Amino acid sequence: MKLLFLAFIICSFATTSLYGQSREAPVAPPLKEAENSSTAQKYFSDVVLVNQHGQQFRFYSDLLNGKVVVISSFMATCTSACPVKNRNLEKLQEAAGDRLGKDVFILSISVDPVTDTPERLKEYAKTYHAKPGWHFLTGKKENVDWALYKIGQYVPEKENHFNVLVIGNESTGLWKKAFGLAKAEDLTIVFASVLNDKAPAKN
């Protein structure tokens, strides 16, 4: 029964597209690609996002490349599903241990970047005892929408945001989705499977 439940809360990206894009695309922001960009960098792009401390990050190069990430979409004014998801993320933050902020990061991306300013998100993050390595991200709407689109979390109407966590190990290429409102202990199992994934040994 436990395995069946885990199968229910996990869905592989392979069942949709490579990274599970949303069906409806936002307007693409101006994008610049380096000549030596990797396939992953070209896909995810380096749109600039801003965290709760006002720090700027390139989406792929700074936030994803070589890292284990748990990504969630939310908005600070959500009072139903988002608090539940964020409490689960608080549990995953503890599960990450001293790797949080080193090679493991939690990325909570606002679907309401106009309202969710860095200042507002800084106060919001305190509610969930966010430690260094848990970024609450906002920025220009076109950049935020594009980042969400690339992880399959973009919605035209912010009230319809997803209750799905995207959990990935960029180094090994293992990506999973999990129901963000599931029990924290079940999400921890999914997180651990991605965290502990190893790249195949080279001959």
Please annotate each region the language model reported:
Residues 66-68, 84-108:
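Conserved helix-turn-beta segment immediately C-terminal to the redox Cys motif
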Residues 160-203:
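Thiol-/selenol-based redox modules, centered on thioredoxin-like
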Residues 48-52, 167-168:
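Hydrophobic beta-strand positions
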Residues 59-83, 89:
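Short active-site neighborhood of thiol/selenol oxidoreductases, capturing the structured segment around
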Residues 122-162:
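Short, internal strand/loop/helix patches
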Residues 94-101, 126-130, 149-153, 192, ...:
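Sec-exported extracytoplasmic/periplasmic mature domains
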Residues 1-50, 197, 201-203:
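N-terminal targeting signals for export/organelle localization
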Residues 103-116, 132-144:
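Thiol-based oxidoreductase modules, predominantly thioredoxin-like and allied folds used
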